[in-house]
Amino acid sequence: MAIVSAEKFVQAARKNGYAVGGFNTNNLEWTQAILRAAEAKQAPVLIQTSMGAAKYMGGYKVCQSLITNLVESMGITVPVAIHLDHGHYEDALECIEVGYTSIMFDGSHLPVEENLAKTAEVVKIAHAKGVSVEAEVGTIGGEEDGIIGKGELAPIEDAKAMVETGIDFLAAGIGNIHGPYPENWEGLALDHLEKLTAAVPGFPIVLHGGSGIPDDQIKEAIRLGVAKVNVNTESQIAFSNATREFARNYEANEAEYDGKKLFDPRKFLAPGMKAVQGAVEERIDVFGSANKA
């Protein structure tokens, strides 16, 4: 299966009552881990780059080339979309130009009418090149590349207006946040999600901040209409924990590890890479997208 737009497989998820994962990558190893997990689970997947991660990796063209060539060299057979996560207007246009197959234009920080107008412009440009479009109403809590939100509930009328711009899937605040959830978090506003999906029947909703939400709430959100769940923090924590454990073991057994040449960065990064793959596979199972390729 070639790299594709996300439109068809996100729509299929919405229609059939499961969700696909949008997994953020940060480097070569993360990309390989996500692809291996998707292939092992035979699940369609979006590999996402935030603006910050793309800058770190060398730019959008580098990211697009890396993912495209890894899909080919690794013999990946499942559908893979290359997706921009929380992109500004100029970034969205650049990603369309360099070959991303899906983009999120995040104008949630703009006045509603300006957000709608710019989203409509992006949709026209993207769809002309077969690129799927995600947009956001309200703001998702937490911080994502300088955009800070408090976890508000997306206004229903704004959501309906955003869908009318022609987007393919909609990110809407339902009490979710980016990053670790605080102990006093009240949970997803599932009653609001139910009202939202009733207002835009059959339309795919995106759940951002998927890391740390209890599985039962995620599954209920999927039942109510969520068709894409974004994951980043969970993978970061898995990578960090595995790498720290390896480093602690190295320090305790330095002579032995040196003898095995475990200072080789390929070996040093391997435990974290394996942990990311495991985290992605586990999320795919929860989302119900295994064997849906």
Swiss-Prot record:
One of its GO terms (biological process) is fructose 1,6-bisphosphate metabolic process. Binds 2 Zn(2+) ions per subunit. One is catalytic and the other provides a structural contribution. Its cofactor is Zn(2+). Catalyzes the aldol condensation of dihydroxyacetone phosphate (DHAP or glycerone-phosphate) with glyceraldehyde 3-phosphate (G3P) to form fructose 1,6-bisphosphate (FBP) in gluconeogenesis and the reverse reaction in glycolysis. Zn(2+) 2 binds at D106, E136. Keywords: Glycolysis, Lyase, Metal-binding, Zinc. One of its GO terms (molecular function) is zinc ion binding. This is Fructose-bisphosphate aldolase. It holds the Pfam family F_bP_aldolase. It comes from the Bacteria. Its EC number is 4.1.2.13. PANTHER family: D-TAGATOSE-1,6-BISPHOSPHATE ALDOLASE, D-TAGATOSE-1,6-BISPHOSPHATE ALDOLASE SUBUNIT GATY-RELATED. D-glyceraldehyde 3-phosphate binds at S50. It comes from Streptococcus pyogenes serotype M3 (strain ATCC BAA-595 / MGAS315). The keyword Zinc applies. The active site is at D85. Dihydroxyacetone phosphate binds at G179, G209, G210, S211, N230, V231, N232, T233. Pathway: Carbohydrate degradation; glycolysis; D-glyceraldehyde 3-phosphate and glycerone phosphate from D-glucose: step 4/4. Belongs to the class II fructose-bisphosphate aldolase family. Zn(2+) 1 binds at H86, H178, H208. The lineage of its organism: Bacteria, Bacillati, Bacillota, Bacilli, Lactobacillales. Coiled coil: none annotated. It catalyses: beta-D-fructose 1,6-bisphosphate = D-glyceraldehyde 3-phosphate + dihydroxyacetone phosphate. InterPro entries: Aldolase_TIM, Class_II_FBP_aldolase, FBA_II, Fruc_bis_ald_class-2.
